[in-house]
Amino acid sequence: MQELLEEEIKLQQIQTLPMKMMQFVSLINPADAIRAIDRIMDKRKDAISIHNSSFMTGLYYELSGLYQTENCLTILAALDILKNLGYEICNKDYYTGFSNVCEMTGLMGRWQKLQSYPDLICDTGHNVDGFKSIRKQLKYIHEKLHQELHIVFGMVSDKDISSVLELLPKDATYYFTKASVKRAMPEDELMKMALEAGLKGTSYPTVVDAVRAAKENCPPKDFIFVGGSSFIVADLLANRDTLNLH
């Protein structure tokens, strides 16, 4: 049954969704996708606006980030298939589920906003594919929103660090650090590799130290990104009170 469901999802993405969701499918293009992210108000999370001809508009996806628009396609296709298989899923379930993902699942650290003025966002991107998606978002923030980038970054030693460093924006200020796990790459070694890759920045022994430095150096109008290894994000979230992040 699982294999059948996965195969049906692929078919739905290729065939059914383009007919039912022409507006939403077009959002796969990053330039279009960003238009679907509604900045509701300060200190409130961004939300992706979803339009589907099979039910009323006004459905908002709590998880933000450009790559989430593609994830929505898979979710909506899977829900259509589950309904066809006999599962009872009403319109209210769509609204409740999409707008309360984090509260219902406990999911954290996926393009999660922790502060305004300056904006501080965290996300995990511990491999090349992950950072390809993050790079698109950072590029938009820098080039279209005209915000300078301050990036707190760390990785574990057993990943393809060189390839990830090549994807990072060259015009950002970096705060290289390490997570509180044995696998974490030492911050000085990471900084050496980063400098060789054309990046600029300073190393810090802990995530807390790095984030504090970024907050001190970043003007209110600019942008702080914290990411790399999932452990970096975990250390950040574990120290939200210490860093006065809400």
Would you name each region that the model predicts?
Residues H126-N127, S157-D158, S180-K182, S230-I232:
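Short glycine-rich anion-binding loops that position phosphate/pyrophosphate groups of nucleotides
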Residues S229-H246:
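Glycine/aspartate-rich loop-and-adjacent alpha/beta segment that forms the canonical ThDP
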Residues I9, A31, N71, D123, ...:
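Residue-level signal for inorganic ion chemistry
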Residues M1-E3, H150-V152, A172-S180:
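Short internal beta-strands
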Residues M1-G58:
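Extended acidic/charged loop-beta regions that coordinate divalent cations
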Residues V25-L27, V152, Y175, T202:
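Hydrophobic/aromatic beta-strand patches that form the interior of the parallel beta-sheet core
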Residues T16, R44-K45, D119-I121, V128, ...:
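C-terminal helical cap/extension that packs against the catalytic core
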Residues S53-T173:
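Nucleotide phosphate-binding/pyrophosphate-handling subdomain across enzymes
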